[in-house]
Amino acid sequence: MSLTLSALPVVLNLCASTPYIVGILQKRFRPSRSSWIVWSTLDSITLAGMLAKGSANTQIISGWLLSLLIMFSVLHVTKATPWKRREKLYLAGGAFGIVLWGLTSDPLTALITSLAVIECALVPTLEGVWNDPEAEPAIPWLLGGFASVPVLVSLDHWTLANALQPIL
């Protein structure tokens, strides 16, 4: 059962990301470049914090790899535009998490900071969908959200480090 629960988030992430990446490359979807750059960068910090705490799961590992693919797909098809101040603040928040991690020697600090900033980085995507509902398909987002369920069900030890990433 544990193998199934470990594999299911990977399968759901692949099912969500594959048509999303294809749609981006075909220019049918127009995701926020800044959101995906921030997410892939901060997913790297989140994964590092979870690995350091011994709490990494298949959802974050597959999600991290796929977020990198999505980011590079987005960068491949979008024009370079100046970064907004808010977008720079999101990346600075991730850097702040790394600094806190170094100062406190506690990877949970970096994990919490990165996850908070990841949630804030959703704002440009939500603004884009509000202004142009056709810019983002709903199914990949729903499948990605459902990928958290098997991770939560399979947790042996409910700690903040284990449960925070799948919940957010």
Q: Where do the protein language model's features map onto the residues?
A:
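Alpha-helical membrane-protein topology signature
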Residues: M1-L168
